[in-house]
């Protein structure tokens, strides 16, 4: 998966994460892009803590459930023990990504948005290939 990290043209203080439009794009890539774009720092710490093998690390917009070395990204997700009485598994919409790959993308995203103000230029961008997580 390839993502493009860039600073918004209208305000170089706003960073944006978009998927790199290529023939390999999938809905999974789009879910990852949305999740990264709104990921909170405390959720990324939980994601990186490998001693946690099950947890709910959602954002304001999207649910995320860690299950050992996989992360489920989607909507209407619950940990098995937290499912409501009227739980309907057919309402779960999700895509699975390797936890290692998502951690790599989150680290790259945070290093991008934490750049010093003087280095945040409107035309600056980085292309991130998640395959680098496995090298």
What are these regions (language model features)?
Residues 13-21, 71-76, 111-113, 120:
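Short, well-ordered strand-loop elements centered on a beta-strand within folded domains, enriched
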Residues 118-135:
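Short, highly charged C-terminal tails/helix-capping segments
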Residues 36-40, 110, 114-117:
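Generic secondary-structure transition motif, activating predominantly at the C-termini of alpha-helices
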Residues 1-7, 11-12, 60-66, 121-125:
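Broad, structure-driven detector of short, well-ordered beta-strand segments within folded domains
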Residues 11, 29, 33, 54, ...:
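Intrinsically disordered, low-complexity segments enriched in small/polar residues
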Residues 51-114:
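Amphipathic protein-protein interaction modules
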Residues 1-56:
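Negatively charged, low-complexity tracts enriched in Asp/Glu with abundant Ser/Thr
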